[in-house]
Design a protein with these regions (language model features):
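Sec-dependent N-terminal signal peptides
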Residues: 13-19
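A structural "domain/chain start" motif
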Residues: 25-95, 100-109, 181, 187-230
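Surface-exposed short loop/turn segments
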Residues: 103-170, 180-194
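Soluble periplasmic/extracytoplasmic beta-strand elements of cell-envelope proteins
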Residues: 51-58, 82-86, 94-96, 121-129, ...
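A short, surface-exposed beta-strand/turn
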Residues: 176-178
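Bacterial N-terminal signal peptides that target proteins for export
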Residues: 2-13
């Protein structure tokens, strides 16, 4: 038995109205997020920039190094990228990039020019010595009145300044930080936070910024010099 035309039209109309309501609820937004910088980068510096190389940055914490880890040190790689940026932003160093040596050599060859690579007296190495995440939650009246959830990430890093000729560690600087995110739902209003993977990068950036500031402070108070004595 065929459905009456009037009923068919009514169903189509309802579907169109529902689609328009759903489409009207969909919103898109975007905004620029302020990038955090080291305190050292805000202090004017008129001295000479000294060449410094960045070596390995390893994850020495237990985070992402369990039995089922694939062996790729993503945390260390992320930390090294952050370190290079913050060192350069201080205005005290000419940071030497060693990750893309083959690519740079190929581009120089294609341009028909000879490379003039610069050496450094010191290499900065780094380690993520502590890293962890935790989630805590609470409920009011067994969750009837509301519940909350808090995510926290903690990181501690250590930077070592190594003399390239003697392999001596001439200076060390550390930094640590904690980031937290919390949401609360009360009587059905609000929402609890889902897992936020960006906390890893934020807390790592915070710890490295502090370590770089301590490194620069040590240089400026004479505890170490980016130029080896001749």
């Amino acid at each position: 038995m065929r459905e009456p035309t009037a009923h068919r039209k009514a169903r189509i109309l309802c579907a169109l109205i529902l689609f328009s309501v759903v489409s009207g609820c969909a919103t898109e937004s975007h905004q620029a997020v302020q990038v955090e910088h080291t305190a050292s980068s805000a202090v004017p510096y008129r001295g000479a920039r000294n060449a410094i190389a960045v070596g390995k940055f390893d994850n020495r914490s237990t985070y992402l190094r369990g039995l089922f880890s694939d062996g790729v040190d993503r945390l260390g790689g992320q930390a090294k990228t952050i370190l290079v940026g913050h060192l350069q932003e201080t205005g005290r160093f000419n940071v030497l990039e060693r990750e893309n040596m083959e690519e740079n050599a190929r581009e120089a060859k294609l341009s028909g020019k000879q490379q003039t690579l610069q050496g450094a007296d010191f290499t900065i190495t780094g380690d993520v010595v502590e890293f962890g995440r935790k989630e805590t939650g609470d409920a009011q009246l067994f969750g009837i009145l509301g519940e909350g959830k808090k995510q926290a990430a903690y990181s501690k890093v250590t930077l070592n300044v190594v003399n390239v000729l003697t392999s001596q560690v001439v200076y060390s600087a550390s930094g640590a930080g904690e980031y937290a995110l919390s949401n609360r739902e009360v009587l059905g209003f609000g929402g609890t936070a889902s897992y936020d993977s960006t906390l890893n990068g934020k807390v790592l950036d915070l710890a490295i910024r502090e370590a770089v500031d301590n490194l620069v402070q040590g240089m400026e108070n004479g505890s170490w010099s980016p130029r080896a004595s001749r």
